[in-house]
């Protein structure tokens, strides 16, 4: 699979590296090289430390060692690290350290691309700030506007949300921006893509001119970095080069499948062979989610499914069942990949390969969370060879053929 580029390969890694190098050599960033190897050495409030340790953290991850303190100092930051390395706790800690808890007004706004991810951030923020008495609320689509207005009127310190609902709350003046001093974009590559870019600008225009901005993502294409220049002031750059994006701890394999129609049999064979704690299966369309779910259930496999056409309440119930372990197999699409944070996921299967190399990391980063071992298996037809080639070049990894002893790896 790692030979010459297949005909029609779209990804130009030389052009990517050239654009990235141009941006990184410009006098746009502030250098910051301090590393804190323990949470105790970061100068954090005692009650924040209590929340961090109660959450289960013992030692800061690499991004936390470098990223929490500059954010706590009020500096603009751009931080890039692999999914599952503690980015969320990095900016949550930075926000919680700086809040004025005597002022029950929104002081920090966090935007995420999906409802599930926004709700996940809300949970982390609330857990880390448990001993501080933080008031945090998620403003997301698919929930009651009136309830959002009621909670915001009663007073919150932090709002986490999706761009559409947050902009609506600002426009209705239910969310007052006067005291917002911190603005965070999570999964910024997605947030700064064409779909969200205009909404982000519209929201930013309504915020105070003097505001701290944090940009966090697993991947940071040059286009996203260029956009950040419009609303950041000499940010601290904690940026991993593309060839340093680690997928360490996640073993990656491919299975050659001659025909699309044979994927289903291959998948069912795998599930009959392997003892799996929990797994996520990715396909590329909502219709395919429904189709594959029906096919697997008809063969007596217990699976759950979630996609953007389902109402929010149904998706919440399904994700709760999956997190609790009562459901062990989840079929979903890229849209919801970023809201899945389940520690026990040991296997990700790309039934369909992602159309963009950047999405590969977001998908397989669902396994091997926080240093645990994980396995990713990619179903590859002849039409998919170009995508696998692009992924290998993009992340500087080798995807090997699935060995016969795959059961020993899980």
Curated annotation (Swiss-Prot):
<feature type="domain" description="Helicase ATP-binding">
    <location>
        <begin position="68"/>
        <end position="238"/>
    </location>
</feature>
<dbReference type="InterPro" id="IPR014014">
    <property type="entry name" value="RNA_helicase_DEAD_Q_motif"/>
</dbReference>
<dbReference type="GO" id="GO:0010494">
    <property type="term" value="C:cytoplasmic stress granule"/>
</dbReference>
<dbReference type="GO" id="GO:0005524">
    <property type="term" value="F:ATP binding"/>
</dbReference>
<keyword id="KW-0648">Protein biosynthesis</keyword>
<dbReference type="GO" id="GO:0003723">
    <property type="term" value="F:RNA binding"/>
</dbReference>
<dbReference type="GO" id="GO:0002183">
    <property type="term" value="P:cytoplasmic translational initiation"/>
</dbReference>
<feature type="short sequence motif" description="DEAD box">
    <location>
        <begin position="186"/>
        <end position="189"/>
    </location>
</feature>
<protein>
    <recommendedName>
        <fullName>Eukaryotic initiation factor 4A</fullName>
        <ecNumber>3.6.4.13</ecNumber>
    </recommendedName>
</protein>
<feature type="binding site">
    <location>
        <begin position="81"/>
        <end position="88"/>
    </location>
    <ligand>
        <name>ATP</name>
    </ligand>
</feature>
<dbReference type="GO" id="GO:0016887">
    <property type="term" value="F:ATP hydrolysis activity"/>
</dbReference>
<keyword id="KW-0694">RNA-binding</keyword>
<comment type="similarity">
    <text>Belongs to the DEAD box helicase family. eIF4A subfamily.</text>
</comment>
<feature type="domain" description="Helicase C-terminal">
    <location>
        <begin position="249"/>
        <end position="410"/>
    </location>
</feature>
<keyword id="KW-0378">Hydrolase</keyword>
<keyword id="KW-0347">Helicase</keyword>
<feature type="short sequence motif" description="Q motif">
    <location>
        <begin position="37"/>
        <end position="65"/>
    </location>
</feature>
<dbReference type="InterPro" id="IPR014001">
    <property type="entry name" value="Helicase_ATP-bd"/>
</dbReference>
<keyword id="KW-0067">ATP-binding</keyword>
<dbReference type="Pfam" id="PF00271">
    <property type="entry name" value="Helicase_C"/>
</dbReference>
<dbReference type="InterPro" id="IPR001650">
    <property type="entry name" value="Helicase_C-like"/>
</dbReference>
<dbReference type="GO" id="GO:0003724">
    <property type="term" value="F:RNA helicase activity"/>
</dbReference>
<comment type="function">
    <text>ATP-dependent RNA helicase which is a subunit of the eIF4F complex involved in cap recognition and is required for mRNA binding to ribosome. In the current model of translation initiation, eIF4A unwinds RNA secondary structures in the 5'-UTR of mRNAs which is necessary to allow efficient binding of the small ribosomal subunit, and subsequent scanning for the initiator codon.</text>
</comment>
<dbReference type="GO" id="GO:0003743">
    <property type="term" value="F:translation initiation factor activity"/>
</dbReference>
<keyword id="KW-0396">Initiation factor</keyword>
<comment type="subunit">
    <text>eIF4F is a multi-subunit complex, the composition of which varies with external and internal environmental conditions. It is composed of at least EIF4A, EIF4E and EIF4G.</text>
</comment>
<dbReference type="InterPro" id="IPR027417">
    <property type="entry name" value="P-loop_NTPase"/>
</dbReference>
<dbReference type="InterPro" id="IPR000629">
    <property type="entry name" value="RNA-helicase_DEAD-box_CS"/>
</dbReference>
<dbReference type="Pfam" id="PF00270">
    <property type="entry name" value="DEAD"/>
</dbReference>
<keyword id="KW-0547">Nucleotide-binding</keyword>
<dbReference type="InterPro" id="IPR011545">
    <property type="entry name" value="DEAD/DEAH_box_helicase_dom"/>
</dbReference>
